[in-house]
Design a protein with these regions (language model features):
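Juxtamembrane extracytoplasmic/periplasmic/luminal helical "stalk" adjacent to the first N-terminal
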Residues: 344-388, 398-406, 465-466, 579, ...
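Short N-terminal helix-loop-first-beta-strand/juxtamembrane motif that initiates sensory/input modules
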Residues: 370-376, 398-420, 448-449, 496-517, ...
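A residue-level marker of the well-folded mature domains of exported/periplasmic proteins
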Residues: 27-346
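Extracellular/periplasmic juxtamembrane segments that couple receptor/chemosensory ectodomains to their
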Residues: 533-597
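Short regulatory alpha-helical segment in sensory/regulatory domains of signaling proteins that mediates
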Residues: 365, 382-383, 396-404, 444, ...
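Solvent-exposed, extracytoplasmic
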Residues: 389-403, 480, 484-540, 594-597
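Extracytoplasmic/periplasmic ligand-binding sensor regions of membrane-associated signaling proteins
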Residues: 421-492, 496-497, 551-569
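Bacterial N-terminal signal peptides
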Residues: 8-19
């Protein structure tokens, strides 16, 4: 009897891959173990994630592979899930969604004997327009969503009675922009005067999991005259189907056949056969034929398409279907090339910038609150222990495993001497004296938890230290438990998935002007008030003074546009993140010519 497991990330830390009984002959032939990590929206999203699930379930049934499903909640859980899956005995690790791209690159390089698959991998290009290389044990599954979207765009335009149709996108990102570009081009190709209304639900991953906003935006587009709306918005798309049922108007689904979400009103669905790509990847790995590199699936490969069956063919007149079939043939033959981007220059609103800033601040707060809670528990567990004992090391190992962005975890005696350090690679620093560090002096004085500013650690790298006091069983101060974190690693996992898809710069600055993180990594570690790079820009220096002095606000300045080397006018918004009295200003900036008037 086959057994399948769905693990929470918390359970994963204890044992990421459970042994699953397999009694089929296929298991003996293909005894591989596969860990699949779901994208935002998770299992039962009615689309993208469910399609990946079906592909792996097929491999379980037909090939006898062992499967573990991981459903992270937020960027920190994603990091833990991926790290744990990669370190486990899984032979193949599958990440469902472009948000895993950078981390998959890192892990594939770190674990060359393990195989990795990233669905919707986010291809990076160098300054010459060439694809940046990635590890040979990483398979990047790419879909030409624009081709399937072109076909449903043609169907929508030909079917529309009002001459207006709509597009509802999730996160404003390159992949979703391909859906939009194909849909718009397909509609215009068969009906040049068609009007296409477009709305995106956000600029971060949360945009894929907001049905209420999806409903409101769909209602607005229906109210403005659109009689058909196509969504590429994950769980957010559920809001479209609610609006379609309320208005009794047409909707177009995505990824899988979504006709059940609004029976009789789903004109068609643009299908994306993630299940097939996942199954074939697992099959190749099981057979020893796995190959890395980019693999592209479009109409020709049956990687995308649209639904036309007994349930919806009555909704699509025969002449429309014939025209669309002819278009499909031209795309497959290469006679017709579908655009991947809309030719218009995308603009952001001021509200967009404020919304992104708020979401990023909230994510940083969640991470710091979790670390605070983990350290508090660690200090309680260490009470009455020898701080250099094996039991103390076990506490540190648990703490280190729960927080993947840490450099190390340690215990410190009441004389400021490092006692036990995890991981093993930093053991040589045991016995080091940290009494000269300012945050230690504050801990000694207050006997309360402390979060430091950025400093040069005895272990080498620039870091931030989080100390929690440890007391003996009779309440005497015994020392501390410390987590040394790398701000760059912590913040990149939160910020990069957003900034890589938008024309923005995002950085965190201490109140002394030190850049502890910047999307432009060359600026990390510079002090805005001291570094020569910033001195030719008096508006920037004046704004930096304002940022330091106030917890939130907005302002304008001039500085170099990343990638161009030319100064441009920019708009900035900032808020404050931090803990225990230590404040970081989180700032988002955008060139003014990329902001709506």
């Amino acid at each position: 009897m086959k057994r399948k497991w769905m693990l929470s990330v918390g359970m994963l830390v204890v044992a990421v891959v459970l042994s699953i009984a397999q009694d089929s002959i296929a298991q003996q032939l293909f005894p591989i173990k596969v860990a699949l990590i779901f994208d935002i929206g998770g299992r039962e999203d009615g689309g993208f994630n469910d399609s990946a699930y079906r592909g792996l379930e097929r491999a379980v049934s037909e090939l006898g592979v062992k499967a573990v499903y991981l459903e992270p909640d937020g960027s920190l859980d994603r990091e833990i899930a991926l790290n744990s899956a990669a370190a486990s005995d899984a032979d193949l690790v599958i990440g469902v969604g472009f948000i895993f791209s950078d981390k998959m690159n890192e892990l594939a390089a770190r674990y060359p004997a393990k195989k990795f698959v990233c669905v919707d991998y986010n291809i990076r290009y160098d300054n010459q327009g060439q694809i940046k290389p990635f590890p040979g044990n990483l398979s990047a599954l790419l879909f030409r969503e624009e081709e399937g979207s072109y076909l449903v765009g043609a169907i929508a335009a030909l079917k529309s009675r009002t001459g207006k149709i709509g597009f509802l996108g999730g996160m404003d990102s390159p992949i979703i922009l391909r859906f939009q570009a194909g849909y718009l081009a397909g509609a215009k190709s068969v009906r040049p005067d068609i009007r296409v209304l477009s709305q995106f639900t956000g600029l971060t991953g949360k945009a894929f999991n907001n049905p209420q906003k999806g409903y409101l935006l769909a209602e607005r587009m229906y109210g403005e005259g659109a009689d058909i709306i196509f969504h590429a918005a994950g769980v957010t798309g559920e809001g479209l189907f609610l609006a379609a049922k309320k208005r009794h108007l047409w909707a177009i689904g995505v990824d899988i056949d979504q006709s059940s979400l609004a029976p009789g009103l789903v004109l068609t669905s643009m299908t994306k056969h993630v299940d097939v790509a996942v199954f074939e990847s697992v099959k190749a790995c099981a057979a020893g034929n796995f190959s890395g590199g980019a693999k592209s699936f479009g109409l020709k490969e049956n990687g995308v398409g649209f639904v036309y069956d007994d349930y919806n063919k009555g909704l699509i007149p025969g002449d429309i279907h014939d025209k669309v079939q002819a278009i499909q043939g031209k795309i497959i033959s290469g006679e017709l090339t579908v655009p991947t981007v809309d030719s218009s220059k995308p603009l952001l609103s001021r509200n967009d910038l404020r919304d992104v800033l708020t979401e990023l601040k909230d994510e940083i707060k969640v991470v710091l609150e979790k670390l605070d809670s983990d350290l508090k528990l660690g200090a309680k567990m260490l009470s009455g222990m020898e701080l250099n004992s094996d039991r103390a090391r076990s506490v540190l190992k648990r703490l280190y495993g729960l927080n993947p962005y840490l450099i190390d975890c340690s215990t410190v005696s009441n004389q400021a001497i490092l006692q036990a350090i995890v991981p093993e690679g930093f053991k040589q620093f045991e016995g080091a004296d940290i009494s000269a560090q300012a945050h230690w002096a504050k801990l000694i004085k207050t006997r309360k938890p402390v979060l430091s500013g950025s400093f040069r650690s005895v272990q080498g790298p620039a870091a931030v230290a989080f100390h929690y006091p440890v007391f003996s069983s009779d309440s005497r101060f015994a020392g501390s438990v410390s987590a040394l974190l790398a701000p760059e690693k912590l913040l990149a996992g939160i910020i990069t998935p957003v900034s890589s898809n938008l024309p923005v710069d995002i950085f965190l600055m201490q109140t002394d002007g030190l850049m502890i993180y910047d999307v432009d990594t060359d600026q990390i570690g510079r002090n805005v008030f001291q570094d020569p790079l910033y001195q030719p820009f008096p508006e920037l220096l004046a704004l930096a003074q304002k940022v330091v002095a106030t917890k939130k606000g907005t302002g304008e300045y001039r500085f170099y546009q990343e990638g161009s080397g030319e100064p441009v006018s920019k708009l900035a918004y900032w808020k404050t993140a931090g803990k225990l009295g230590t404040e970081w200003r989180i700032v988002i900036t955008c060139a003014k010519d990329r902001i709506e008037k």
